[in-house]
Each structure stands twice: as structure tokens, then as C-alpha cells.
From Swiss-Prot:
It is found in: Secreted. Its main location: secreted. It comes from Arabidopsis thaliana (Mouse-ear cress). The lineage of its organism: Eukaryota, Viridiplantae, Streptophyta, Embryophyta, Tracheophyta. InterPro entries: GDSL, SGNH_hydro_sf, SGNH_plant_lipase-like. The active site is at 41 (nucleophile), 348, 351. Glycans are attached at residues 118, 263, 275, 330. This is GDSL esterase/lipase At4g01130. GO terms for cellular component: cytosol; extracellular region. It is an enzyme of class 3 (hydrolase). Belongs to the 'GDSL' lipolytic enzyme family. GO terms for molecular function: hydrolase activity, acting on ester bonds. Coiled coil: none annotated. Keywords: Glycoprotein, Hydrolase, Lipid degradation, Lipid metabolism, Secreted, Signal.
Amino acid sequence: MASDINRRRSFSLLVLIIVMLYGHKGDSKCDFEAIFNFGDSNSDTGGFWAAFPAQSGPWGMTYFKKPAGRASDGRLIIDFLAKSLGMPFLSPYLQSIGSDFRHGANFATLASTVLLPNTSLFVSGISPFSLAIQLNQMKQFKVNVDESHSLDRPGLKILPSKIVFGKSLYTFYIGQNDFTSNLASIGVERVKLYLPQVIGQIAGTIKEIYGIGGRTFLVLNLAPVGCYPAILTGYTHTDADLDKYGCLIPVNKAVKYYNTLLNKTLSQTRTELKNATVIYLDTHKILLDLFQHPKSYGMKHGIKACCGYGGRPYNFNQKLFCGNTKVIGNFSTTAKACHDPHNYVSWDGIHATEAANHHISMAILDGSISYPPFILNNLCSP
């Protein structure tokens, strides 16, 4: 698997070099002026913690050296994409101080779902900022930008231009919580029943953004959550349910079902939207390969979390998450981070490390996991 991916990426890199030498407009800037992101904790750059301030502990230790509103030890995929396109990190839409929206906004929040939650954050842990809410925030943001320019309001220096919405990337990395939140309680087969509704909501959101001017959409598929320490310790299973890499077979089969349906739905959406670019990003392929062959990427640990409690094989405890402290067996215990997160695929049993995010980002940028082919690296001048 690792060699197949490497061959594909080598071919994509060759195509990229040829295009840059013969087909690139040397005097152009980025084809895209902004990024508008919709998602959950996999792409939240601080929205959740702006709404519910509390983050502490080892989060952000690798790059930011302190908690930075991200569910990782460092940068996320969206951070790498923004920087590669010559943009600053995306400001969270919910952040009131220090935001700069000239190059887009991030509507993602930790624990968000595609479907509207039927319970509260404090009962289920699910964010109130579902995809529908994020879409409404995007629409209101556009209204405010248009009005601010028309009325020459103060604060224009931190807002994008009125024409930016047709020259932006719209990225979606959401759906994981819809899949995992009910997994332990109702099982894989019952979760699969509502996955078409999840995908339909994503496609519908793309169509609504197209209606207000959006033309380029990138949709990241669902990760192989059957390899996540949090799922491996929280989902009842036998040894027969595990593949040779230690991942849950029935869970990852359901993920594959979701991704196949997502790809098919996006293909149909692509035919319905004139002059739109709708890209399916198979980030699952890279992340699965990272879990299965970490050494091929210069890493050591696949299904073991860097930050957690419990030791081998998963270093994850359902009652003691990364950075938290509680009394276990009459002793105060803290779920601490490892000293070398660059050697781990899993940061906290639920999210990827910066190192894993970097590998995934490089595959997105070189076009090796884009369907149809879409070499994002080629859209900016050197």
C-alpha cells in the first residue's frame, strides 16, 4: 500500500513540475484569495474555545508552544493548506479579538456534526454549531461584508473584498462525529442507516454556497476511525474483529461505505453545478497507510496515542482524556503527552498529530488524492 501511494505521488510530482515549467502564469498570485472552512475539531482553529474558553494542557506543544485552539500538538491540515497558498492561518469566525478575515474565515468548531444535534453540548458533548449553523454564519458573514463595503463602515481593513466569495476555496472536513457519536450505543449497522442523510446535507450545503457565489469546493472524506484508540477502547469487539494492523474491521468497512457514497454523491453534485469545481479528497487513504505503515513515513507508532493514559497498546482511557487529571485508585493521575509526538500518528486517541497532518496535507497539495485531479500546489506562483 505504501509503495502504491509513493508511486502515485511521484507521478503527481512529475506532472506538477511539468505544469509549473510550461503552463504556469509566472506573474500571477494565488488563484484563490481566501479559504472558508466548515468542519469539526479536525479543522477547528479556535472557534470552540472562543465560545467555551477552557483549553489547557499540552495542546499546541509542537508548533505553537501553548494551547492554540486546535485539537492537536500543532498545526492542522487547514493550517498547512493556508500557508501553502500564501495565506495566514484562518481566524475562527467566533473569535472576537485579534481576528483577520481578509483571507477567509473558519466556521469549524470542535464536536460539530453535519446533522442538527438533538441534545445539548453538556449532555452529549456534541457542539451546537452543526453544519447548518455554520452555513448560516457564512451567509451572515457575506451579508456583513457586503454591507460594510457599501456603507464604508469602520473595520474594513480586516474584511475581505466583496468579490472574494467567487475566488475562494470552500473546504469541508466534517462528518466524523455523526459517525462516531452513536457507534457504541447503537452499533455500526444502525449508524449506516443515517449516513446517506449526512452526505446529502453536505451536498446540499455545497449547492447553497454555490448559490451565493462559491465555485471551488474541497471535501475531505472520513478517516479510518476503526484505527483510533478512542474507538478501539470504546467499541465492544473481539480479536476476530481486528485486522492484522489492530484496526476494527466492521467499523472501517462502514467508513468505506460512507466514503464510497460521498464520492458518488459529489460526482453527481459536480454535474449539477455549472462552472463549479467539486473535489473529493481521499485523505482516508493516507491516514490509513500512516496507521498501517508508520515506519514508511519516518514514524514509530500507529494505533498508540501520544497524549493519554494507560500505556500499551493504545495509551487511551475513556475516563481520562489528554491533559486531564482525576483520581484513579486513590492517586491523582494526569493524562500526559509523550515527548516525541512526531513519532506518532494519533495525538490524543481521537485526532492526528501535526506530523500526520503534514503528510496528509502534502498529498492534498500534490493532487495525489484528489478526484478528479486537482493540483492545489500549482495554483500559486513560487
